[in-house]
Amino acid sequence: MDLPGPIHDFLLVFLGSGLLVGGLGVVLLPNPIFSAFSLGFVLVCISLLYILSNSHFVAAAQLLIYVGAINVLIIFAVMFMNDSEYSTDSNLWTVGNGITSLVCTTILFSLMSTILDTSWYGVIWTTRLNQILEQDLISNSQQIGIHLSTDFFLPFELISIILLVALIGAISVARQ
């Protein structure tokens, strides 16, 4: 959106704080229904951030796919669970939680060190090639495909990892 600087900055801070509050709600709320609604709020904030950065097609896809389908599916799955399955236990920290947090922390630091140690020299040539290709492409959807497979490759990979972890978590909760 073409907004004046202060309004754009205010909306950016507002949506960022909404993302933080919603993410904390997903993790910290004891009721899974409220966590699922908080996840929907986070996904809507991400969609609004896409609109703020003039990516209207990606924002619409975000709303349709993630909020409209996946979050509704999560809410239905949680609603079919029994109340006793997500009751609070007296044992808050187990050995499995410690191992899981150790593995996740190790993966996080290895990803951070890999990203920091990688030479990003070839990325400049890729963006220049994309600028040349964009002039030749007729369709807007082809331009979106080029951007999603080059400029936004890392965020899409991170989203796929997050969805995989959510799927594994949902399976483990359903099996208990």
Curated annotation (Swiss-Prot):
Alphabetized UniProt keyword annotations: Chloroplast, Membrane, NAD, NADP, Plastid, Plastoquinone, Quinone, Thylakoid, Translocase, Transmembrane, Transmembrane helix, Transport
Transport listed as a keyword: yes
Organism domain of life: Eukaryota
Molecular function terms from GO: NADH dehydrogenase (ubiquinone) activity; quinone binding
Reactions catalysed according to its record: a plastoquinone + NADH + (n+1) H(+)(in) = a plastoquinol + NAD(+) + n H(+)(out); a plastoquinone + NADPH + (n+1) H(+)(in) = a plastoquinol + NADP(+) + n H(+)(out)
Class of this enzyme: translocase
Cellular localization per UniProt: Plastid, Chloroplast thylakoid membrane
InterPro entries reported for this sequence: NAD(P)H-Q_Oxidoreduct_6, NADH_UbQ/plastoQ_OxRdtase_su6, Nuo/plastoQ_OxRdtase_6_NuoJ
Gene Ontology cellular-component annotations: chloroplast thylakoid membrane
Mode of membrane association: Multi-pass membrane protein
Residues in the signal sequence: none
Classification via Pfam families: Oxidored_q3
EC number in record: 7.1.1.-
Disulphide bridges: none
Transmembrane parts of this sequence: 10-30, 32-52, 61-81, 92-112, 152-172
Quaternary assembly: NDH is composed of at least 16 different subunits, 5 of which are encoded in the nucleus.
Assigned protein family: Belongs to the complex I subunit 6 family.
Physiological role: NDH shuttles electrons from NAD(P)H:plastoquinone, via FMN and iron-sulfur (Fe-S) centers, to quinones in the photosynthetic chain and possibly in a chloroplast respiratory chain. The immediate electron acceptor for the enzyme in this species is believed to be plastoquinone. Couples the redox reaction to proton translocation, and thus conserves the redox energy in a proton gradient.
Name of the molecule in the record: NAD(P)H-quinone oxidoreductase subunit 6, chloroplastic
